[in-house]
């Protein structure tokens, strides 16, 4: 992720309005996704065309297929924020050498992306780098083998659990699947997904809770991590005051 300055807001937004992108345009390279159809015609802050044009014209290397993605907001000051444009594969978030390589390659590609935007996207002629993200973003590393591991069926079919400690909308983003929370559908979050097998008095929350890949595409999101984190914090406090092991706490009391 990087952040630009020097953008002509008016020209940039005119181009966005003239050639709007929808979620159906997430159909190439690293951004190829399956939807359930309802998202396809919705507006998406997606940019791909200038990078493809730069590749076609030889401005960017022909094998560079990882550039393309979304932008956050454009301001009167000329700042264009949250350029989530660079996607890197085969980076092991538990390996320091991989992380170093990812930091270097990600920043190199960000500068190439800026070069393409300056040449091919209205409003970006005078754009320049404002700053990089503090570190490479990692979506998935180690996962807990929990007393209950959430499944794709749970997150796609409004899973319900007797030990639910919270709910989360049907928002799934990852592993080639995109379902946006537009219908009011939601899943429950089971307390057991934070409890490791064969280890007592330990709670694991955040993106490391138990689940398969598609479940992770939902539970990794920050707002879901906040819900689970709230439940874990309450459970930990109750366990301390009641001298009760985490696995023995009543989920109804936590909820």
Which functions belong to the PLM regions below?
Residues 1-205, 209-215:
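Mobile, glycine/GP-rich and aromatic-enriched active-site lid/loop segments adjacent to catalytic centers
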Residues 209-224, 228:
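Amphipathic, heptad-repeat alpha-helical segments used for oligomerization and assembly
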Residues 239-255:
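Non-catalytic terminal regions with compositionally biased, polar/charged low complexity
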Residues 226-243:
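Internal hydrophobic alpha-helix adjacent to the cofactor/substrate pocket in enzyme cavities
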């Amino acid at each position: 992720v990087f952040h630009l300055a020097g953008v002509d807001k008016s020209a940039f937004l005119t181009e966005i309005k003239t050639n709007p992108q929808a979620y159906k345009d997430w159909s190439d390279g690293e951004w190829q996704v399956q939807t359930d159809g309802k998202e396809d015609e919705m507006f998406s802050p997606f940019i791909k065309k200038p990078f493809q044009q730069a590749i076609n014209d030889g401005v960017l290397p022909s094998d560079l297929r990882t550039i393309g993605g979304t932008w956050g907001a454009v301001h009167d000051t000329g700042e264009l924020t949250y350029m989530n444009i660079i996607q890197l594969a085969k980076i092991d978030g538990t390996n320091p050498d991989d992380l170093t390589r990812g930091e270097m390659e990600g920043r190199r590609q960000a500068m190439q992306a800026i070069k393409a935007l300056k040449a091919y996207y209205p409003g970006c002629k005078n754009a320049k780098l404002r700053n990089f993200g503090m570190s490479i973003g990692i979506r998935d590393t180690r996962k807990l083998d929990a007393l209950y591991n959430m499944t794709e069926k749970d997150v796609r079919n409004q899973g319900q659990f007797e030990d639910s400690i919270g709910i989360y909308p049907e928002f799934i983003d990852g592993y080639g699947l995109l379902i946006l929370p537009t219908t009011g559908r939601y899943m429950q979050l089971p307390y057991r997904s934070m409890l490791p097998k064969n280890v007592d008095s330990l709670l694991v929350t955040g993106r490391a809770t138990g689940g398969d890949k598609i479940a992770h595409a939902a539970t990794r999101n920050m707002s879901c991590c906040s819900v689970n984190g709230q439940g874990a914090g309450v459970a930990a406090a109750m366990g301390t005051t009641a001298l009760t092991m985490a696995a023995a706490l009543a989920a109804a009391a936590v909820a």
